[in-house]
């Protein structure tokens, strides 16, 4: 399985299927989490699952794989009160996610954007 396939499967199983066993399958036990609001390792992910809105939805669009790094540009609903645009950066080692960074920004509708553009002008990939 390619690294980007690992990331897509991991995120789908954990966040869409709500399958907590995906944590053991796809994340290294002591993975490093660079988001300052989340803990490292499996326990941080397990806690996150309990905090997510039941309507949480992660829609990846642009996906880039370069060696051991996978980057996704996604639309996320249910993270907060408004949709957010997220760039996730994953480092993969031996088939597991070992490190994660992200940048999160509230979605601005085109009617309020200076250029009038969507923040996700790509075709959303449904998984």
What annotation goes with each model-predicted range?
Residues 1-127:
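C-terminal and inter-domain tail/linker signature
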